[in-house]
Amino acid sequence: WSTIVKLTICPTLKSMAKKCEGSIATMIKKKCDK
């Protein structure tokens, strides 16, 4: 993912991932950590 996408979308996705459990949360974290 581009840096801009990471900086803007990933904080939102990570906050959502905290509410989610399982594979979806893991997938978001993996994509945002790259």
Curated annotation (Swiss-Prot):
GO cellular component: extracellular region; membrane; other organism cell membrane
Statement: the UniProt record of this protein carries the keyword Transferase: no
Disulphide-bonded residues: 10-32
GO molecular function: calcium channel regulator activity; monoatomic ion channel activity; toxin activity
UniProt subcellular location: Secreted; Target cell membrane
UniProt keyword annotations, A-Z: Calcium channel impairing toxin, Disulfide bond, Ion channel, Ion channel impairing toxin, Ion transport, Membrane, Secreted, Target cell membrane, Target membrane, Toxin, Transport, Voltage-gated calcium channel impairing toxin
Tissue expression profile of the protein: Expressed by the venom gland.
InterPro entries cross-referenced by the UniProt entry: Ectatomin, Ectatomin_sf
Taxonomic superkingdom: Eukaryota
Function: Algogenic for animals, human and insects. At high concentrations (0.5-1 uM), it acts as a pore-forming protein that forms nonselective cation channels both in cell and artificial membranes. It is weakly selective for cation over anions channel conductance is identical in both directions. At lower concentrations (1-10 nM), this heterodimer inhibits cardiac L-type calcium currents in isolated rat cardiac ventricular myocytes.
Similarity comment: Belongs to the ectatomin family. Ectatomin-Et subfamily.
Subunit structure: Heterodimer of an A and a B chain; disulfide-linked.
Protein name per its UniProtKB record: Omega/M-ectatotoxin-Et1a subunit B
Protein's organism: Ectatomma tuberculatum (Selva ant)
